[in-house]
Design a protein with these regions (language model features):
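Adenine nucleotide-associated cytosolic modules
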Residues: 1-264
Length: 264
């Protein structure tokens, strides 16, 4: 047992009760030792991850790193929502899927991947699109939403459902070499409609098919979204509420812009 594991377990076995909100089992103390020894993290933050229910809308480019990192981090329950199937052209950036998954529903492929990575979590695949008929029912049972979609109709719907239910939402988007992300937390900061009051003109934003997508920037932004999710779920750090983080893969680093709720 290395030093980090020894410090995490503190030399004692934990109560073996996954349903308990007061203890981690010894297996978890070992698996998540590098989290637990972090300053400001500890067993309490890890327990919060274990007890969290997270809805990930979209199991494509952004959904791939989001799902992999949240499952590895120890989120206890993941709902994966996507109505699309894996296409070979997806594999350049949608790293949760394999060649053998081509033609399979993305939600099912992603569920298999996260359970291979962490067999101790519960993963639910929902092969459907977020719509007016299911949005509130899906969102209300979760502690956090991650919007990994690629169209404004679904983005507005996810944000509106988050606002109605009071559920925080981590949002991200990719355009060629660039990405953006933010956290929309009802009653704590502005929402998506404050940032984008109107849908951008259809011809102003090229699709991935037409304009292309730089694979590594998808991983960058998706990993940052997973970081924001962990901050929201555990209470560590400062989530990007009221902040728009802009990543330019051809430059160096990222820049952060502030925005506020529309007074109207």
């Amino acid at each position: 047992m290395d030093d980090a594991v020894s410090r995490a377990t503190n030399g004692h076995d934990a109560v073996e009760d996954m349903g308990s909100t007061t203890s981690l089992i010894n297996r978890d103390l070992i698996r998540y030792a590098r989290h637990i020894v972090l300053p400001g993290f500890g067993q309490e933050a890890q327990r919060r991850l274990r007890d969290s229910r997270v809805l990930v809308v979209g199991a494509g480019g952004l959904g791939s790193p989001v799902l992999l990192y949240l499952s590895a981090a120890g989120v206890g329950y993941l709902t994966i929502l996507d109505d699309d199937v894996v296409d070979e052209s997806n594999l350049q950036r949608q790293v949760i899927h394999r060649q053998a998954d081509v033609g399979r529903p993305k939600a099912l492929s992603a569920k298999d991947a996260v359970q291979r990575l962490n067999p101790h979590l519960v993963a639910e695949a929902v092969v459907a699109r977020l719509g007016t008929d299911n949005a509130l029912d899906l969102v209300k049972d979760h502690d956090l939403i991650l919007d990994c979609t690629d169209n404004f109709t679904t983005r507005y719907l996810a944000s509106d459902a988050a606002e109605i239910t009071g559920t925080p939402l981590v949002w991200g988007t990719i355009l060629q070499y660039q990405g953006q992300l933010s956290v929309f937390w009802p009653d704590r900061g502005p929402m998506l409609r404050d940032l984008f009051p109107e849908v951008p003109a259809a011809d102003s934003v090229p699709s991935a098919v037409v304009g292309g997508t730089f694979g590594p920037v998808v991983g960058q932004v998706g990993s940052m979204m997973a970081t924001e999710a962990v901050k929201v779920l555990t209470g560590i750090g400062t989530p990007a509420v009221g902040k728009l983080v802009v990543v330019d893969a051809l430059g160096v680093g990222a820049r952060t812009l502030s925005f506020a709720a529309d007074p109207d």
